[in-house]
């Protein structure tokens, strides 16, 4: 990984900071593991905008990533290559299993082409191997953590993400997440050892608005720049500050208001995030 600052040969290049990884595969992705990905422009079946700031962008294919890793226990796999994935911040690794099947997984940090990986209860403790949490030593760093056994990884999947296994008690283990939250998870759930690759992703700078448009992100208009019919902060003679505490276009408090409402899983949280 290398952080590259572009020379200011044009206004659009002046602030560009790239993360360059020479190990990334330069060819096409593995075709059998691709699926069509259609664009909605943020509209639903009625043609109405349900998610703002979506539209345009380069055409993409979805890579089918194996988040479960539960039906290849004991079958060794060789990392064929590490690839870029436009659908996520992390890189993905193409595995070739001993039975001849190929699958994508989230690429762990430090894993490169030619490495051997395996999943299952007897897998050695090394980055990239997937085990049940009850078989992972206390103090280990893990990612791709399930919340329900067999459902597939849900926690710590983005670039540089990880959690630390800090305790094991009965049928539960306790994890410390990057947010500072400490949470109980069933020991039957699976996780992958190590942290997610591409941890330098947060250091990049796109440099210009057009680079966001290439990614399918449209501009965000401030509420105070709108008319009263469009936003609670809109209207007024001349420039105004909105005249009230910040709210969304639908009048709900924003900028710090708590939105968590899942009381059913409150019992699994040992300590709230910072």
UniProtKB/Swiss-Prot annotation:
Residues 28-54, 224-274 are annotated as: Disordered. Residues 263-274 have a biased composition (Basic and acidic residues). Keywords: Ribonucleoprotein, Ribosomal protein, RNA-binding, rRNA-binding. Gene3D superfamilies: 2.30.30.30, Nucleic acid-binding proteins, Ribosomal protein L2, domain 3. It comes from the Bacteria. Pfam families: Ribosomal_L2, Ribosomal_L2_C. GO terms for molecular function: rRNA binding; structural constituent of ribosome; transferase activity. GO terms for cellular component: large ribosomal subunit. One of its GO terms (biological process) is cytoplasmic translation. Transmembrane segments: none annotated. Part of the 50S ribosomal subunit. Forms a bridge to the 30S subunit in the 70S ribosome. One of the primary rRNA binding proteins. Required for association of the 30S and 50S subunits to form the 70S ribosome, for tRNA binding and peptide bond formation. It has been suggested to have peptidyltransferase activity; this is somewhat controversial. Makes several contacts with the 16S rRNA in the 70S ribosome. NCBIfam families: rplB_bact. Belongs to the universal ribosomal protein uL2 family. This is Large ribosomal subunit protein uL2. It comes from Pseudomonas fluorescens (strain Pf0-1).
């Amino acid at each position: 990984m290398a952080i590259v600052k572009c020379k200011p040969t044009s206004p659009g290049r002046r602030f560009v900071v790239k993360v360059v990884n020479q190990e990334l595969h330069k060819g096409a992705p593995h075709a059998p593991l691709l699926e069509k990905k259609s664009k909605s422009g943020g509209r639903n079946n009625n043609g109405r905008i349900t998610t703002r700031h979506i539209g345009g962008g380069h055409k993409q294919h979805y890579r089918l990533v194996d988040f479960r890793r539960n039906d290849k226990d004991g079958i060794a796999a060789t990392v064929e290559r590490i690839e870029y994935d436009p659908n996520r911040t992390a890189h993905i690794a193409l595995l070739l299993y001993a039975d001849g099947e190929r699958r994508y997984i989230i690429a762990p940090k430090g894993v490169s082409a030619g490495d051997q990986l395996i999943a299952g209860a007897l897998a050695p403790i090394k980055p990239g191997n997937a085990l049940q949490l009850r078989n992972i030593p206390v103090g280990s760093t893990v990612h791709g953590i399930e919340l329900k056994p067999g459902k597939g990884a849900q926690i710590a999947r983005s670039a540089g993400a990880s959690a630390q296994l800090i305790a094991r008690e009965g049928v539960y283990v306790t994890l410390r997440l990057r947010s500072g939250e400490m949470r109980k998870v069933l020991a039957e759930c699976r996780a992958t050892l190590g942290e997610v690759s591409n941890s330098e992703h947060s250091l990049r700078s796109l440099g210009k608005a057009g680079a966001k448009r290439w990614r399918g992100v449209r501009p965000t208009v401030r509420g105070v720049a709108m008319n009263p019919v469009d936003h609670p902060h809109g209207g007024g003679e001349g420039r105004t500050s909105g005249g009230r505490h910040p709210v969304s276009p639908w009048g709900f408090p924003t900028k710090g208001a708590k939105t968590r409402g899942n009381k059913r899983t409150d019992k699994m949280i040992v300590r709230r995030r910072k």
